[in-house]
A protein has these predicted regions:
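Catalytic phosphate/metal-binding cores of nucleic-acid and nucleotide-processing enzymes, i.e., regions
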Residues: 1-65
Length: 65
């Protein structure tokens, strides 16, 4: 699975299906489905900080790449 890395993120909220992520790369926090987070991601739950790794497909759909 191809992946896309977004550095210096923070999870500010989580649900059973998604996390709400803040990043300097986003104008506003973005919801990211758990199913689109790559196993190499450093963030998974509320309070986590680090690099977010998502599928390349999801990043393309969001206009991040």
């Amino acid at each position: 699975m191809s992946q896309h890395i977004i550095e210096n993120c923070k999870v500010i909220k989580e649900t059973s299906k998604a996390i709400l992520v803040e990043s300097d790369e986003f104008d506003e926090p973005e919801w990211v489905p758990q199913s689109q987070i790559h196993e190499d991601s450093e963030i998974w739950k509320e309070g986590d900080e680090g690099d977010l790794v998502v599928t390349e497909w999801f990043a393309e759909q969001k206009g991040w790449i």
